[in-house]
Curated annotation (Swiss-Prot):
ATP binds at G172, D173, R174, K175, T176, G177, K178, T179. It is a peripheral membrane protein. Residues 548-558 have a biased composition (Basic and acidic residues). It catalyses: ATP + H2O + 4 H(+)(in) = ADP + phosphate + 5 H(+)(out). The gene is atpA. Residues 536-558 are annotated as: Disordered. Transmembrane segments: none annotated. GO terms for cellular component: plasma membrane; proton-transporting ATP synthase complex. Keywords: ATP synthesis, ATP-binding, Cell membrane, CF(1), Hydrogen ion transport, Ion transport, Membrane, Nucleotide-binding, Translocase, Transport. Its EC number is 7.1.2.2. This is ATP synthase subunit alpha. It comes from the Bacteria. The keyword Translocase applies.
């Protein structure tokens, strides 16, 4: 058996050397204690150095956000299941302000307000992390909104156009089609995405706040069937989630979108809906014992929405020229747009589309009330062809609504009023559009050219939509060059208008109304109608000559 060659002195020297070279890793950890917990709110003692909006770690890996920094304790919102958090448990500071992962890999995914995937498709490889509370672009970092963002909805693109970088509010009662308008807008970006041109491509973020799981699933299914999930991210805070998740969801979606905007990309974000976020923030504030204001909302509820929506912008060219377009949704009660939250958001945004219950029930869908809806960007966000054909549309519809109310009580109407009523009824029918069927802008121009140009006056109201559909099918097959010219030049030249008029006239000859009657106007009847209209206008505008009597002739002036 071999003898040991290591002596006791060698062992002693090795131990002494190791002990002398050992340096203990010491770190300072600030730990607090849960004083009370309930309704997703916890009060914690013993964290004197905590920052506002800092993440706190509760037992079991559950996170919370420090909101109230009081003298003796910290009020924190728990993000997740608070049932297992008990009084006396330890809480650790993380040293990190609330942030979420961002990057290209988020397209096509469904995440929660912490940026964690919830679609069962594995982890997401993030490019970076972005803080939720960041300063919005300043005045010098912005430029004016001048590029159109087509929604594919005729009534919006014609009368309340939206530009890239704009904030357009979609407001109305429940079940009036607010979500449908925004989903159609996302679907309409597919053609731009498939073009492969970064200047045309628009990435989309859909933020669902307090929605039912089935509602979010149906939206996702509609986007998948329309080929829109390739460029869309869904941030979901379910109705069953805590108030903290509903409060944070819009900021998470905005952070993901801002990452692309500052990278020079164009982004569209939908907040569905901010009413539920305000209600969640009200619940959090009341539980934290913050003083309530109007309708029990806290005093900073305006700032809650303004600092979110101010992030939507069209960046200056030296910052890449990216844009973030916002479509916030607000739900009203009994069409009351003068309530607290609706008026707040109306004052923050650049316009609103007001959807009305009565119009929706009459079958006018999208149920946009033209009189109340407005876009403060206006013609700057429209192509020239759309300006030409839709210039008089809002006025025509407003006059039609006034005459319609008057005609309900008047038995006898002059020819001009009857013509306006007939034209208005056809315009209303023309602006109706099925859900999930957005229309390219060049086809919208042709459709509106039909209505405002009077080409539908001889078509029965019940056949207007069929006439429009069949004419567009005919043009796609036989007159593709008209669509191509409008799409590429973005203008409707006199030559294009003349050729389009000839196409419509020839198409009318082969089109039969529901009863089998021809829609080609009789030239003789049309001339008589024109003469009748002229006479009516003469009656209105011509001065009536004063009748002079013999007595007046002989009388001398004083």
């Amino acid at each position: 058996m071999a003898e040991l060659t290591i002596s006791a002195d060698d062992i002693q020297n090795a131990i002494e050397e190791y002990v002398s070279s050992f340096t203990a890793d010491t770190f300072r950890e600030e730990v607090g204690t849960v004083v009370d917990v309930g309704d997703s709110i916890a009060h914690v003692e013993g964290l004197p150095s905590v920052m506002t909006q800092e993440l706190l770690e509760f037992p079991g890996g559950i996170l919370g956000v420090a909101l109230n920094l009081d003298e003796h304790n910290v009020g924190a919102v728990i993000l997740g299941d608070f049932e297992n958090i008990k009084e006396g448990q330890k809480v650790k500071r993380t040293g990190d302000v609330l942030s979420v992962p961002v990057g290209e890999a988020f397209m096509g995914r469904v995440v929660n307000p912490l940026g964690q995937p919830i679609d069962g498709r594995g982890d997401i490889e993030a490019e970076a992390r972005r803080a939720l509370e960041l300063q919005a672009p300043s005045v010098v970092q912005r430029q004016s909104v001048k590029e159109p963002l087509q929604t594919g909805i005729k009534a919006i693109d014609a009368m309340t156009p939206i530009g890239r970088g704009q904030r357009q509010l979609v407001i109305g009662d429940r079940k009036t089609g607010k979500t449908a308008v925004c989903v159609d807008t996302i679907l309409n970006q597919r053609q731009n995405w498939e073009s492969g041109d970064p200047k045309r491509q628009v990435r989309c973020v859909y933020v669902a706040i307090g929605q039912k799981g089935t509602t979010i699933a149906s939206v996702r299914r509609a986007l998948e069937e329309g080929g829109a999930m390739d460029y869309t991210t869904i941030v979901a805070a379910l109705a069953s989630d805590s108030a903290g998740f509903k409060w944070l969801a819009p900021y998470t979606g905005s952070a993901i979108a801002q990452h692309w905007m500052y990278d020079g990309k164009h982004v569209l974000i939908v907040f569905d809906d901010l009413t539920k976020q305000a209600e969640a923030y009200r619940a959090i504030s009341l539980l934290l014992r913050r003083p309530p204001g109007r309708e029990a909302y806290p005093g900073d509820v305006f700032y809650l929405h303004s600092r979110l929506l101010e992030r939507c912008a069209k960046l200056a060219d030296h910052l890449g020229g990216g844009s973030l377009t916002g479509l916030p949704i607000i739900e009203t009660k009994a069409n009351d747009i003068s309530a607290y939250i609706p008026t707040n958001v109306i004052s923050i945004t650049d316009g609103q589309c007001f959807l009305e219950t009565d119009l929706f029930n009459q079958g006018v869908r999208p149920a946009i009330n033209v009189g109340v809806s407005v876009s403060r960007v206006g013609g700057a966000a429209q192509i020239k062809a759309m300006k030409e054909v839709a210039g008089s549309l809002r006025l025509d519809l407003s006059q039609y609504r006034e005459l319609e109310a008057f005609a309900a009580f008047a038995s006898d109407l002059d020819a001009t009023s009857k013509a306006q009523l007939e034209r208005g009824a056809r315009l209303v029918e023309l602006l109706k559009q099925p859900q999930y069927q957005p229309m390219p802008v060049e086809e919208q121009v042709i459709s509106l050219f039909l209505g405002t140009g009077g080409h539908l006056d001889s078509v029965p109201v019940g056949d207007v939509r069929r006439f429009e559909t069949e004419l567009l099918d005919h043009i796609r097959v036989a007159q593709e060059e008209i669509l191509t010219e409008i799409r590429e030049s973005q203008k409707l030249t006199d030559e294009a208008a003349d050729s389009l008029t000839e196409v419509i006239k020839s198409f009318k000859k082969g089109f039969a109304a529901t009863g089998g009657a021809s829609v080609v106007p009789n030239e003789h009847v049309a001339a008589l109608d024109e003469e009748k209209l002229d006479k009516e206008s003469v009656k209105v505008h011509q001065a009536i000559p004063a009748k002079t009597s013999e007595k007046s002739k002989n009388s001398t002036p004083r």
